[in-house]
């Protein structure tokens, strides 16, 4: 069994909550993860930027945290393409871990049926 420590970066509507896409209030723009073995040793890393399709301008807070420009993302792969590569990288048997439970809600349309979700917030 391996552990996938997940870190997501996302953007949101730059014009405020009133104008956000209610079906997609947060858009993932980066998936990062490390894979740990049963001894909790790092055995691999994953990091891919994602081309945004909903919010094509950064929210001011996102911009201040990530130090990216939209030019950095314009030629990247779409979320479904990156997610497919990420799940393939995860392998067959793993447990997702994260420092922040919100990552799982952001990914919720794309859960893995072969894995358990574990968050420090449930302990």
Show which residues each predicted segment covers.
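Conserved non-catalytic scaffold segment of RNase H-like nuclease domains
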Residues: 2-104
